[in-house]
UniProtKB/Swiss-Prot annotation:
Function (record text): DNA ligase that seals nicks in double-stranded DNA during DNA replication, DNA recombination and DNA repair.
CDD domains according to UniProt: Adenylation_DNA_ligase_Arch_LigB (cd07901), OBF_DNA_ligase_I (cd07969)
Family, as annotated: Belongs to the ATP-dependent DNA ligase family.
Catalytic activity: ATP + (deoxyribonucleotide)n-3'-hydroxyl + 5'-phospho-(deoxyribonucleotide)m = (deoxyribonucleotide)n+m + AMP + diphosphate
Stored HAMAP family: DNA_ligase
Top EC class for this record: ligase
Protein name, entry field: DNA ligase
Record-level GO BP terms: cell division; DNA biosynthetic process; DNA recombination; DNA repair; lagging strand elongation
Amino acid sequence: MDFSDVASYFSRMEETTKRLELTSILAELFKRSGDDLKKLVYLVQGKLMPDYLGIELGLSDKLIIKSLSKASGRSEEDINRIFSRLGDLGSTAEEISSSGIQRPLLKESLTVDYVYNQLIKISGYTGHGSIKTKMDAYIDLLINSGPMEIKYITRIITGKLRLGVADSTILDGLIEAFSEKKYADDIETAYNFHPDLGYIAENLMMGNINELLNAGPVPLIPFKVMLAERLQSISDIRNKMGHNASYEYKYDGLRTQLHFLKGGIKIFSRGLEETTSSFPDIVQNFKSYYSFDSCIIDGESVPYNPETGELYPFQMVSKRRGRKYELTEKTREVPIVMFIFDILYLNGKSLVNLPYPERRSILEKNFKENEYFKLAKRIVSDDEHDIMKFFERSIEEGCEGIVAKSNGIDSIYRAGARGWLWIKFKRDYQSELSDSLDLVVVGAFDGHGRRKGTFGALLLACYNSKDDTFETVCKLGSGFTDEMLSEMPRLLGDKIVEKKPARVNSSMEPDHWIYPSLVLEIRGAEITVSPVHTCAMNIIEKGSGLALRFPRLIKPRDDKKPEDATTTNEIIEMYKAQKKVIEKS
């Protein structure tokens, strides 16, 4: 398939914010792609491979500007001026290409296959001379492309394709192109266990629907973890669970999935990032204490004091992440214990369709506790007094609260799902909300007075999982330290976009639109009906949405993707629960 055709489809996608229209455009594109489908699906995502493989192109804005200068004969200063005016390197490359560059007499045929393979080459070049080789490969794409093609190729390289489609929309496009809607839930389940859209696309195109219907966990391939809903009283939880639940501590750590196969171990975060290199102690200790052919476990890695057993806050784990140097020292400074609360796979057999009590029993039989690996503390009870005592003990021992888990026969492991099989409970409703919210930055307002020259406030949104959009819920201006405030323009600078991102639903107009990427943990006083914010618009009250009053920043959540943010439905449930508590008091 010619990449010029792909660029035309990308242009059409940029012109709409309607999800159904985006899905139809994608379906049409996928049907035309033929053998290029798998590569094309990755390119639509702005990637070359699934995230968990960690492939990076490694061509910075500065190197692209140098390449544009070399190919066009224009100075880097001139190109930087164009970049400043347009605010987008893809559009800059388009303008440079339009204004004339020296092209070869015999141009390469710019197919999807050719573009993809050139990008793979760019990602693979390392070591001495790699910068020149990467630049030459980009120039090769530039001189063989038309203006529109190089615009999108450059955006893919810089990680700023931003077509307004999330993985769920791409899945819908694939289903419309190659399958039937009746299989949609099963295909989504397959994707949650095997989060590689190229793999899903290939199987759908080849008619291998049974491969996807039978999909389950695969050692060394990360899965989307199961998540919990929330309620604000033990009584509500008992009623929701049908008085048939277990209760576990909710640890304040880093969600960790550990995969073991034939002596090899991989560790992944909640966001599917491989973090094996950050936890050499977990790897070494697992091999020392356990002997399996294969297994996959789900748990929480928590920093602790080995002398006292005291658990430390989550933020201390982050000191290890991304460190290549001084890791041995950090491992000594911040020892880790992994609290295991689920098992998905053992010795060649998937366990995800077993009820939770059976999976827990398998854990207890096969994982003997030691200093480095412990099972999540648990009780099985329907006595409200006992459950509350267990909750209070969890707080005393440094946890966030407890998680109720259904003991019913339907209590399977639902990858990627947030449902009522697991319900978290953090603390009683008092003067403010019983739980924090994870919200996405979608806009910024310029500061005044002491905050002049930086951002004064941020526009935050929740995630509407049904519509695949981000709906505004509050304007955040408190909880920042001076250091955080000065860092915000740097953190968000390359996320600033000229117009409202396609997936953002907002009636407010910030000074700067921010592409949804940064997640912040926020606490507030209460959720109120709002004519300004779009969260749950027209659901509670006609012409109004829901807003968080008096929001304040707790901490950034760099372990979460935008789609992991608090959902619209969760905020609706929190509003209803809050209203019920107020009416009782």
